[in-house]
Regions:
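An extracytoplasmic/periplasmic, membrane-proximal ligand-sensing/linker region
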Residues: 23-25, 50, 154-158, 240-295
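A structural signal for short loop-to-beta-strand junctions that line the ligand-binding cleft
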Residues: 77-79, 95-114, 137, 219-222
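C-terminal lobe and pocket-closing loops
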Residues: 110, 189-254
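Secondary-structure junction motif
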Residues: 139-150
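Bacterial N-terminal signal peptides that target proteins for export
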Residues: 1-8
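N-terminal (or domain-start) structured segment
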Residues: 21-102, 144-145, 156-184, 189-193, ...
């Protein structure tokens, strides 16, 4: 009789635990811990926890390691943040991660790109800063595609020399330290609030808080209206859970902490972007000059 009671109790606790178990959704970081991707992944993970998820941040550091992780049966569904520039860079290095209806969950945001100089520079516009120069060094994250400044050098007669850094945080440090003349980076809260730099132009089609659009300064540059679109890529999410995950990620985007983050950096939240995959491929097409066939 005692064994029967113990068995019933064990079954009861097993059922109860199953019913009340937290849903799992990890946030994977296919890069290092010094850039925006890591900070944003922690922001997303915390918001998921607020929604009742069991969520951990898993750092895989690069595309190859990330593919290996995705192939494992970890028993923990997840997502990772991936932007248009990173996709193109991964493809150029032969690290193909399929983007399709199954893997592309939804857009996190569309973010402006910006050009910044040190605050101690006397110039208050990019044209003023470039005036009289024959060469300018431009810091950027190493994940950007090759040749992005070729058109600028050709059209302005000024040699734009690219200097790569490992992550946007180190790019900013490089500018402040005087390692480069200017930087081209994502327009985020970090750049906006930093008193040691001034960001003077953006990829928006309209001025942003007094900053001129690139299209006004560099009217023929192929990236003058191109920002960065970042989306949630599914990792081992069961098909029957996908719709719930997508809906919950929309809640994450509109949560106070995440919405505030996006608003302060003048980003467009994914919940306001229509035809999201089409928007993704449109930017990829611009970045690659319509040469990228692989999807």
């Amino acid at each position: 009789m005692t064994k029967i009671k113990l068995t019933i109790i064990a079954i009861f606790f097993a059922i109860t635990s199953s019913v009340y178990a937290k849903p799992i959704l990890d946030v994977i970081v296919p890069s290092g811990t010094s850039g925006n991707a890591f900070a944003e992944s922690n922001l997303i993970s915390d918001a998921l926890k607020d929604l009742g998820y069991d969520s951990e941040v898993v750092v895989t550091r690069n595309c190859v390691n990330n593919k290996t992780y995705m192939a494992k049966d970890t028993g923990r569904p997840g997502v990772f943040l991936r932007d248009t520039g990173r996709y193109v860079k991964d493809e150029s290095r032969g690290c193909h991660v399929e983007v399709n209806d199954d893997s592309f969950i939804s857009v996190f945001y569309n973010r402006n790109q910006t050009m910044c100089i040190r605050a101690d520079e006397s110039a208050n516009s990019i044209p003023e800063f470039l005036q009289g120069r024959k060469k300018v060094t431009v810091g950027n994250t190493a994940s950007l595609i090759d040749g992005i400044y070729d058109d600028l050098s050709k059209d302005t007669g000024i040699k734009f020399v690219r200097v790569d850094f490992k992550g946007s945080k180190k790019t900013l440090k490089g500018l402040v330290a005087g390692d480069v003349d200017m930087m081209y980076t994502g327009f985020t809260k970090r750049e906006i609030k930093n008193k040691q730099i001034k960001c003077l132009a953006v990829s928006s089609t309209e001025p942003v808080a007094g900053r001129d659009p690139f299209s006004k300064i560099f009217p023929t540059w192929h990236l003058n209206k191109t920002g960065t679109l970042k989306y949630f890529h599914a990792v081992n999410i069961p098909a029957d859970q996908r719709a719930v995950v997508e809906a919950d990620l929309d809640q994450v985007i509109t949560s106070k902490s995440v919405a505030t983050y996006l608003e302060k950096a003048f980003m467009t939240p994914g919940t306001k972007i229509k035809n999201q995959q089409e928007a993704f491929w449109s930017i990829v097409s611009v970045l690659t000059g319509n040469k990228l066939a692989s999807k």
